[in-house]
């Protein structure tokens, strides 16, 4: 009986995690044609400015998103901030999936630091 409760709990946990999974660059790149643009947005809380190497434990408003103009609301790559090593991994993933970095620009709000990375799809 105790084993059944453990199995049910594990199954519910696994289903919950799968249901709330985030998207990969590869998944978000599907259906994007050569020559189209996409934007990676790195959004940090102002206090994350000094936590760029190690990230932080709480998620807050920090996130990394990939906008392709499809408007399907599946643009979240990661919620929270795991440090700039993770940003580099995502930028390398963009390159591996046929994207070329065109430009970057910062946006500074009262409580957020936002950096946009503009990419062009160069490979199908």
Show which residues each predicted segment covers.
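Terminus-proximal functional modules
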Residues: 2-8, 19-124
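Repetitive helical segments and hydrophobic/amphipathic motifs
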Residues: 13-14
């Amino acid at each position: 009986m105790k084993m059944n409760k453990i199995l049910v709990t594990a199954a519910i946990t696994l289903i919950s995690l799968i249901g709330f999974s985030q998207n990969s660059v590869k998944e978000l790149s599907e259906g994007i044609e050569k020559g189209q643009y996409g934007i990676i947005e790195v959004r940090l809380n102002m206090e994350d400015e000094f936590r760029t190497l190690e990230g932080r434990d709480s998620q807050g408003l920090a996130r990394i998103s990939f906008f392709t103009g499809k408007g399907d609301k599946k643009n979240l790559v990661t919620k929270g901030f795991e440090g700039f090593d993770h940003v580099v991994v995502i930028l390398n993933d963009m390159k591996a999936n046929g994207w070329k970095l065109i430009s970057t620009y910062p946006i500074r709000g009262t409580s957020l630091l936002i950096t946009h990375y503009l990419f062009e799809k160069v490979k199908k």
